[in-house]
Each structure stands twice: as C-alpha cells, then as structure tokens.
UniProtKB/Swiss-Prot annotation:
Primary localisation category: secreted
Protein name as catalogued: Caerin-1.6
Source organism (scientific name): Ranoidea chloris
Subcellular location per the Swiss-Prot or TrEMBL entry: Secreted
Taxonomic lineage: Eukaryota, Metazoa, Chordata, Craniata, Vertebrata
GO CC term, one of those recorded: extracellular region
Keyword Secreted tagged: yes
Domain notes: Contains two amphipathic alpha helix regions separated by a region of less-defined helicity and greater flexibility.
Entry's family note: Belongs to the frog skin active peptide (FSAP) family. Caerin subfamily.
C-alpha cells in the first residue's frame, strides 16, 4: 500500500538526509 511505499522511500532517503542535518546542527 501507500505506507509501504513511503516506508521504502524513507529507508532509502533517511541515511542521506540525517548526515546533512547533523552537519547543519
């Protein structure tokens, strides 16, 4: 369903987004 797609996208994107946010903090 939609949530499974969002979950897959989140798992793919989060590892790239978290380091960027950490650097800005």
């Amino acid at each position: 369903g939609l949530f499974s797609v969002l979950g897959a996208v989140a798992k793919h994107v989060l590892p790239h987004v978290v380091p960027v946010i950490a650097e800005k903090l």
